[in-house]
Amino acid sequence: MTQSYLINTQTKTAVIPIMRNASSMLEFVLKKDGWVITKDRYPSADFTYYTVWRDPYERLISALQRELCEVYDQNLHRTHAAVDAQMNEWSNDPQSIVDLNHTISQYDTCIDIVPQNKKLIVYPYAQISSMLFAATGKLHNDTPKMNVSADYPPPIVELWQEGSVYTREPLWMSGWCRKEFSKDYDVWERLLKADTLSIIETY
């Protein structure tokens, strides 16, 4: 299913969020300026497409942390045990991670939206404000705070504290992540090597 994204039909511009918290933030900022949310696969071949890209491993962990928050909320009488059980389940069956709503490949998300042979302008996740300026021509100083892991419940924060079993090298599931999201890594590594703030991908 095509993920929702934002378009401005007057400027023929589209912005593709690649994470749930980024999606909420972009909707908050752009809907005030006449942008609309759509799931139309190809609104127009003459749109200019923008997105931000995140380190695939950091994005995976961020998505799993949000999933763990739901586990926590549903098991308040046994939070540590429930969180540990979920981590063990993912460790033993990594493919179950792929079926989660927010772990879809960034590449797959974009290729499902951007028309064939159309260019996508990609910024690093840390440059989301620069991407917004490029897409809108406006500075946005009213962006809401993005979700940060420090705000999560203690049992989830503890999993990723320095020295835990999940933060030791090699990082938990990092090899599987690189294999499963290899195309995401290809784009991310091109961004890291670029001498410009953004790169252009063609699908």
Where do the PLM segments sit?
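PAPS-dependent sulfotransferase catalytic domain
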Residues: 4-7, 36-53, 57-202
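Extended, structured, electrostatic nucleic-acid-contact surfaces
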Residues: 4-17
